[in-house]
Amino acid sequence: MKKLLNRWFCYALVLLCSTMYAQPCTFNDVIERTIYSSYKKYNADLDMLAVLNYKKTDFYGFIGVNRKRLRITFTSIKKSEENKDVYEVEGFSSVMNKNKRTFKGTFSLQSHYKFTEPTFEEPLKNGDIEGFSTFSYQLTEDEKLSATGVFKGEMLVLWSKEANKKPIYSNIFFYTDGERNYQFFGTWTSYKTKKTSVASWGVYRIPCSDDFDEGVGDFIPAPKYWQYGWEEFRY
């Protein structure tokens, strides 16, 4: 009986450890892998239009279990006339350079944050701020077309702001290995099958890439994914 209990204890311990180390990536993980400084909430109204419009194309992105190359291009990002915390978005997507599909949607503000200490050795000028903002997003493709669905998730973007000016897009942590910005972490759900797949993209890196990105200082897709639209990175 004692041996049986010991065996069950060992089995339970292995199962627990496996569960602990196999937790799915979360948006909090995305924040931790992007931000290299302490921060706190920043309760202020910010006009994020210039920040969000700074980068509209040339994101790295993937979709599905095979990490097929996903390209996202924004053609229009503007403020909602009805809600100051919502930005109306238009653009198009393609997968492995095929199936170009237009979408419309929104970025909805969640929170602003500011860094509590300078990100460089040199202190900021009086009144200047560095920080980031988080948004939820939903991008809806044309349901009348084949192979279409809805992109949905959360996003963060880094910015800097001089005193009495609007924030601007900023690569604050450009000196770090694995630098990244404008990180979209989410899913795509097919209208037809209702199946949901991972679909994420970003500047310089893709959030929660797991074994996909082998690079340290640079973005390098693993060889087993080259056939899914990443041939240009073949080495």
What are these regions (language model features)?
Residues 1-27:
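Bacterial Sec-dependent N-terminal signal peptides
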Residues 25-235:
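Central antiparallel beta-sheet cores of small beta-barrel/beta-sandwich binding domains
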